[in-house]
């Protein structure tokens, strides 16, 4: 039991000499409760982080259009109108922890409009810096600055992978991977910048483009090399440098592994109640895809991909669940 307590406190670095003295004073009779409360006072050892604002950065995976449409599958209500609260984006799932809503999706006129996305369609890693600059300067129209109380959500990199892949074979794979690693370094630097500004950060690795329907098609179309495997290697190069470059401290940064998530979902779709993890579900271009514009017999809750490179509702839901776990489980 004592070993278990030591693991909790020393692992998170939250209690010093005074904390251990308090444990000793409590005595063996209450050792089992030390993990949760201090002896006699009922005060938690760790203050639970309560975000006062959620800020999302990155690409279209985190975009809500002005009318609440998503680059995924948009749900419809009984009147065939878009229900922007249903089939939530991962950033909406995280904001819901705090009862926050985004201004683009507030059909109930909630007063808790404290979640904002600066993400943009087509954004690459170098544009993440501009998004953060915009927020710091107050140019986003949502209240400037970034600081304590802000929870920043970051997901970018897929468009970088696709852009780099498009340069093959004009550029060698080695050159492309070097470029991808440099972009991973830049991504890590921007995550650390958010921490230095005072925010807590949940950053997701880029989705593995090598397991997408796009990758399946590319592999079938070219015989020079396994194009799907190449897309995975480019993704891994970017993600790998991001992972080693971000601040390795769970008090400030929570990491979501979206690349491993989609890899697992593709390998074992039944484990996630999926009936299809390799094909495209939408018959129209995003963000105009709705539950009424899907291929016959398909449902967004059981198909992984909305289009060739973007997650359907099933993928967004899983990603949101993982990010929510980080928001609630990390010692922010």
Map each language-model feature to its residues.
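Conserved active-site regions of diverse hydrolases
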Residues: 2, 39-332
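Sec-dependent N-terminal signal peptides
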Residues: 17-30
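N-terminal secretory signal peptides that target proteins for export/translocation
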Residues: 1-18
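Intrinsically disordered, low-complexity regions enriched in Ser/Pro/Gly/Gln/His and often acidic
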Residues: 12-13, 32, 296-298
